[in-house]
């Protein structure tokens, strides 16, 4: 893609002509958005568009070549995803976003995004189809939750914003997705007979739910430089998301001040008129044909101002990340040897280890040169066909018969190689002189009771079974996974075969460690209280270095610091949101997802949101709160890219002292939760800050959390804006949503 002979002139959008839209809502300049550092990109984009004919503008917004007096433009190239480039050789396979979120590490999230972005840039790809904020994880049965950052909007939003910034700084356009309320695979394109033939389901939610939960992360994306947003293939409140003017023109482009383009997910664009007027900016030429669009212009259905706005939005992200400087390498075919991986394997290994949460440890970890170690489960070793075997989750089983380290569909990376736990443990055993045995499937058990050396022979051979290998082992490592992805939702939150394997091994091995990699919440209660299950490592999908990351944790080369981004329940019935099988999917739970629902109904989880152990211990003290005595009820700032300017103002701080009172260096993740006055109608408490602090044994540090206006605001349905409630706020600081070690209060007087 290149601009050549670009003539820059001053051209702004013209006044709106007659249109079926009653106002200029959603048009960039008509909104009065203070563009800030987007202004230069806007001027370049509008100058280029000013010299185009109607046909050329239509070519631009449908992804065709444009040749004009102002220069030539070749279409932007869009590609998945956050875990690395799809369909290319010589690229890296990174941790999935759900794993990255489990690091609770701002630097890790940003640095991975920048590394991913650099590989896109150097392969000649302009638009990353990401970050994937949503599916948020409304239901633990959702198939694509693994691709996102989890169901807490604050954590999801921060990770979405940091990922967006990483892509921008790498020189590519972030294309945040999926907008909006796309939370399951079931019936995403299916028909419902006479109730909606051929239509996807409709996600129905009120404004409070939308703003406080699902729209929240997109504020962060827009604020940090999103140049594109993908509208979902499903409906919202009865209208296709890509034709929904309330979502696209009102919320995204006006409330959030989004300056970039909206483009559709697969099957997201259904009609020419609906998508053009609803807020889509880039679409299919088969739907937006020249004759159709010209007829819309001539009869006043589509205004010239809206067409210009669409064209400018297609270009503004390109200029914003400076792709017009001519430095990006030309895109090659996928198999051409252009190695863009740099030293990203080191980053992938580090982030994978940072992301795994130690849920349980009764002194068995870290390992230290065990004499005899056995490993069990298909998840420990490679799949027969290699790491890039096609994974079609439609109709597949709920587990993966090999080491699961990347997603499927849009969430599947292009693996250059895969280090499995079997690979990494073999190397470690060779270094330590450990006898290593393995059964690399989930169901191989033919009875047992044999000792390490059978009496019938002088060989060390043992009939392979769970019982035989577990008996006589110093340590038993059992690897299990849970599979789901694009195209199919989950059918279970546990697996009978895998759970039986864990119990069988534990019945015969005093030190059984379970290692779990999963696409979403995975229930553990079939074996978690077994006396011989002495440790559990739990995480998401870690990418090409997965086995090394896991073994670094098992042996203590890395001290665990990962934290859960979802609640692990004791029973499936403890979760309040299941899959929807009807045409109308009503989000009647409102904002009460995950820990917010568990807290509201006083349900005891197996492991709470934010939980994770370390090989050392930490002490919390010295809570200090600095809050204003008064504040205006609503934001008064100008509309900027990312919403009202003062919505982002820091209005208070909370600090606490964290001390490592153990014997090993480690990282703690202190978390800030906030309880609102009753008048705000909010959950019991909500995450409103966190940090990851590395401390040597005996070291301590003061951690400070900034409270922004948006962090103490709620969405007022009557006034249709963010408001601050007056009254008492309760502050909690601790190691999880249930491990709250410090608390205090502050009062706010709210003026007009």
Swiss-Prot record:
It comes from the Eukaryota. Its main location: secreted. Residues 1-18 form the signal peptide. One of its GO terms (biological process) is cellulose catabolic process. Its EC number is 3.2.1.21. It catalyses: Hydrolysis of terminal, non-reducing beta-D-glucosyl residues with release of beta-D-glucose. Pathway: Glycan metabolism; cellulose degradation. It is an enzyme of class 3 (hydrolase). Keywords: Carbohydrate metabolism, Cellulose degradation, Glycoprotein, Glycosidase, Hydrolase, Polysaccharide degradation, Secreted, Signal. GO terms for molecular function: beta-glucosidase activity. Coiled coil: none annotated. Belongs to the glycosyl hydrolase 3 family. Beta-glucosidases are one of a number of cellulolytic enzymes involved in the degradation of cellulosic biomass. Catalyzes the last step releasing glucose from the inhibitory cellobiose. This is Probable beta-glucosidase D. It comes from Aspergillus oryzae (strain ATCC 42149 / RIB 40) (Yellow koji mold).
């Amino acid at each position: 893609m290149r601009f050549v002979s670009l003539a820059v002139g001053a051209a702004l959008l013209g006044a709106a002509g007659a249109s079926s839209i009653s106002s200029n809502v959603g048009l960039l300049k008509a909104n009065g958005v203070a563009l800030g550092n987007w202004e230069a990109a806007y001027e370049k984009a509008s100058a280029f568009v000013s010299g185009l004919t109607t046909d050329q503008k239509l070519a631009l917004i449908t992804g065709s070549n444009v040749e004009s007096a102002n220069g030539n433009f070749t279409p932007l190239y869009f590609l998945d995803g956050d875990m690395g480039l799809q369909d290319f050789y010589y690229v890296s396979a990174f941790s999935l976003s759900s794993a990255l979120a489990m690091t609770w590490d701002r630097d890790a999230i940003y640095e991975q995004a920048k590394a991913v972005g650099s590989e896109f840039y150097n392969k000649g790809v302009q638009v990353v189809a990401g970050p994937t904020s949503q599916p948020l994880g409304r239901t633990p049965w959702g198939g694509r939750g693994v691709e996102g950052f989890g169901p807490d909007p604050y954590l999801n939003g921060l990770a979405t914003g940091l990922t967006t910034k990483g892509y921008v700084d790498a020189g590519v356009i972030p294309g945040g997705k999926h907008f909006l309320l796309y939370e399951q695979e079931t019936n995403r394109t299916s028909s419902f007979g006479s109730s909606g033939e051929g239509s996807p389901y409709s996600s129905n939610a009120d404004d409070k739910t939308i703003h406080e939960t699902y729209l929240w992360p997109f504020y962060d994306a827009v604020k940090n430089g999103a140049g594109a947003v993908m509208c979902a293939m499903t409906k919202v409140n009865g209208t296709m998301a890509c034709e929904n003017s309330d979502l696209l023109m009102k919320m995204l482009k006006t409330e959030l001040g989004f300056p970039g383009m909206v483009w559709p997910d697969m099957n997201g664009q259904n009609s020419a008129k609906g998508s053009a007027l609803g807020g889509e900016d880039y679409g299919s030429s088969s739907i937006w044909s020249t004759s159709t669009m010209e007829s819309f212009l001539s009869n006043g259905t589509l205004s010239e101002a809206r067409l210009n706005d669409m064209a400018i939005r297609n270009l503004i992200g390109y200029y914003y990340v400076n792709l017009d400087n001519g430095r990006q390498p030309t895109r090659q075919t996928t198999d051409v040897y252009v190695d863009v991986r740099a030293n990203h394997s080191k980053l992938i290994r580090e982030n994978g280890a940072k992301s795994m949460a130690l849920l349980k440890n009764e002194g068995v970890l870290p390992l230290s040169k065990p004499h005899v170690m056995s490993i069990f489960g298909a998840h420990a070793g490679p799949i027969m066909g290699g790491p890039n075997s096609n994974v079609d989750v439609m109709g597949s089983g709920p587990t993966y018969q090999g080491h699961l380290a990347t997603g499927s569909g849009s969430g599947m990376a292009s693996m250059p190689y895969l280090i499995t736990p079997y690979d990494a443990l073999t190397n470690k055993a060779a270094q330590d002189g450990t006898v290593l045995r393995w059964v690399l499937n989930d169901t191989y058990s033919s009875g047992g009771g044999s000792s390490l050396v059978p009496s019938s022979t002088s060989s060390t051979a043992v009939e392979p079974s769970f019982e035989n290998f577990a008996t006589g082992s110093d340590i038993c490592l059992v690897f299990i996974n849970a599979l789901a992805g694009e195209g199919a939702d989950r059918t279970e939150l546990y697996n009978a075969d895998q759970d039986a394997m864990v119990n069988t091994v534990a019945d015969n091995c005093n030190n059984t460690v379970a290692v779990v990699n999963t696409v979403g919440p995975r229930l553990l209660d079939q074996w978690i209280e077994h006396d011989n299950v002495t440790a559990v490592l739990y995480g998401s999908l870690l990418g090409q270095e997965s086995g090394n990351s896991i073994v670094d944790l098992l042996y203590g080369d890395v001290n665990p610091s990962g934290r859960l981004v979802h609640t692990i329940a004791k029973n499936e019935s403890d979760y309040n949101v299941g899959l929807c099988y009807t045409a109308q999917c009503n989000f009647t739970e409102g904002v009460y997802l995950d820990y917010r629902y568990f807290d509201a109904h006083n349900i005891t989880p197996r492991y709470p949101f934010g939980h994770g152990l370390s090989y050392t211990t930490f002490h919390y003290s010295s809570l200090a709160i600095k809050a204003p005595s008064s504040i205006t009820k609503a934001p008064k700032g100008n509309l900027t890219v990312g919403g009202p300017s003062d919505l982002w103002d820091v209005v208070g701080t909370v600090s606490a002292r964290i001390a490592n009172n153990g014997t090993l260096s480690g990282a703690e993740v202190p978390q800030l939760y906030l309880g609102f006055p009753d008048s705000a109608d909010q959950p019991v408490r909500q995450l409103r800050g966190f940090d990851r602090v590395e401390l040597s044994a005996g070291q301590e540090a003061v951690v400070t959390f900034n409270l922004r206006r948006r962090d103490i605001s709620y969405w007022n349905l009557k006034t249709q804006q963010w408001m601050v409630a007056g009254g008492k706020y309760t502050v909690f600081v601790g190691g999880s949503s249930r491990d709250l070690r410090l608390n205090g209060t502050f009062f706010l007087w709210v003026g007009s």
